[in-house]
Amino acid sequence: SYAPLLAKKGQTNWNPDLIYFDNTKVYPTCSYYVQQMFGTTAGDYYYGDVAKVEGADKFQGTSCVLNTEKRELYIKVVNAAAEAKKTAINLSRFKNLPAKATMTTISGQPDVENNYEVQPIAPVTKEVNISKKMNITAEPYSCSVIRIKL
């Protein structure tokens, strides 16, 4: 959970909140988008060996879960470093993989944040090619989720 969720402009007691609003506008924060990305990609089976980072990297984390009801595989990659990082993905255990998947990424410099005038940090979704063994590059300061329909 995340509290507080909503904050009205000029009425906040602390930072951060997830969604800010005034009488005419609403803007979600970067944290809101990350919560949304992870909240919509929950799984009930974890695969600890599908996504691997190079070496012992304290700035990068990965997770791979299967939602058995939706028959979707979710690979999550977080890169908290100032430089791009590679992640090796091994999907050999999965049969009948599609050729394409979607990847949603949110990224931005640590000192940039959304506000009432501009929202420079928002998720971008694109189609990606997938294969049994592949590498992806995680952008600096990014969070990505790859959705694969099985």
Task: Indicate where each model-derived feature is located.
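Aromatic/acidic polysaccharide-binding cleft in carbohydrate-active enzymes
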Residues: 1-69
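Active-site-proximal beta-strand/loop segments in catalytic clefts of secreted hydrolases
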Residues: 2-5, 78, 106
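Conserved, mostly hydrophobic/aromatic
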Residues: 35, 75, 141
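Acidic, Ser/Thr/Pro-rich beta/coil linker or hinge segments at domain junctions
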Residues: 94-138
